[in-house]
Amino acid sequence: GSSLNASGVAGGSGGGAAIYSSTGGTGNSGGYSPVEGYAGGDGTSGGGGGGGASEVGANSPVHSGGDGGDGVANSITGASVTYAGGGGGGGRTDGGKGGTAGAGGSGGGGAGTNDNSAPVAGTDGLGGGGGASGYYSGSSNGADGGSGVVIISYISTTAKAVGGTITSYTDGGDTYQVHTFTSSAAPHTITANGDVANTRAQQKV
C-alpha cells in the first residue's frame, strides 16, 4: 500500500492506493504471459486492496479498506496450495465513520487495519502481501509481505538431486520428487546426484 494521498506502487502485483482517490499500482511489471499479478485497488476515503496473482485488489468502499486480490492455486507439491494473495487496505473509524479494514486475499495476504490496531503480515512461504495500516494508526507503515518459495518437481521413484527440503508424492501411477526452498538468506542450489538419465523437471514455481 501507500502513504496518505499516494498512489500504489507497480510490481509483480500492484500495491493498493492510499486514501483520497489515488490510483492503485499496476501489476505484471515484467510484462509476462501468462500474467504474473494484477493491479492494486484505488483509494477513496479508505485504502485500496493490494493486487493478487489471480485478480485485482478491490477499490476502497467509503471509509473502508478494499480487500486484497486472491492468489493463484498450484499443485506442484501434490496438494493444492494458493500463493501470492494481496494485502488488505486500511480503513478509518475516527469521528464515527465506522469504516472496516480490508481482508487479505486468499494465498497468504494479510488483513489491513483500522486506526490504532496493527495490520497483519503476509504469510511466509506463500508470498502474500502485507496488510495496510489504518488512517490514525500512529504509523504510516503497513505490515511486511510474506517470504516466497521456490519449488522444483520431477518424476522419479527416488531423489536424483540434493537441495532444499525433499518430499515425494504419487499421482496417476507416477512418483514425483519435490525440492522446496523457503529460505531467503541462502542460495537456492539443486545438485544432481549423477543418476539423472531420462529425468526432466516437470514443474517449477
Describe these PLM feature segments:
Residues 1-205:
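Low-complexity, glycine/proline-biased repetitive segments and flexible coils/loops
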